[in-house]
Amino acid sequence: MHSSTILFVLGAAILAVNGVTTALIDDEVDKGTQEKHRLLRSNLMKHETGEERFELPAWFIGSKAYKQRKRERYEQAKRYYYTLVQDKNHDETFRELDTKRKTLKSALKFIAWNYKGFSNYTKRRIRKKYTAYRIKNPRPW
C-alpha cells in the first residue's frame, strides 16, 4: 500500500471522528455511546404507571386483530359447513343467514373461502333444502 493512500485513509478517519464529536457536542450530549445505550436500556425497563400506557406498534396490533378475525371467520364457516352437510339444524342456519341478510350463494362462497368447498352433489342437496325452507318461510326483507 502506498504511503499517500495510508495518509488519505487516516485523514478521513480523523475527520469522521471529529465530525461525530462535534455533532454530539452541538446536541449537548456529552455521554459516550456505552453510557447512552445503558440509559436507553434502563428507560425501556421502567414500568409506566397512571395514565401512561405501553403502546404496541400499529403493525403488531393490526396483525393480531387480523389473525383473530380470520380465526372467527374460520370457526363460523366451519359451523355453517357442518350444519349444512349433516342434515341437522339446517333451518337454524338458514334463519341465521336471514338475520344477517345473507343469501345462500354468498354463504356458500363464505364457507368455501374460509373453510372448504362443497361437492356438486352436496350443493344441490343444500339448495333443495334451502328452497323448501324458503317456501315455508318467505324472506323477511
From Swiss-Prot:
Q: Where in the cell is it found?
A: Secreted; Host nucleus
Q: What does this protein do?
A: Secreted effector that completely suppresses the host cell death induced by cell death-inducing proteins.
Q: What is known of its domains?
A: The RxLR-dEER motif acts to carry the protein into the host cell cytoplasm through binding to cell surface phosphatidylinositol-3-phosphate.
Sequence motif RxLR-dEER, residues = 38-53
Q: What is its main location?
A: secreted
List GO terms (cellular component aspect): extracellular region; host cell nucleus
Q: Does this UniProt record's set of keywords contain Signal? A: yes
Q: Where is the signal peptide?
A: 1-19
Residues modified by glycosylation: N120
Q: What is this protein called?
A: Secreted RxLR effector protein 69
Q: Which UniProt keywords apply?
A: Glycoprotein, Host nucleus, Secreted, Signal, Virulence
Tell me the superkingdom of the source: Eukaryota
Q: Per the similarity annotation, which family is this?
A: Belongs to the RxLR effector family.
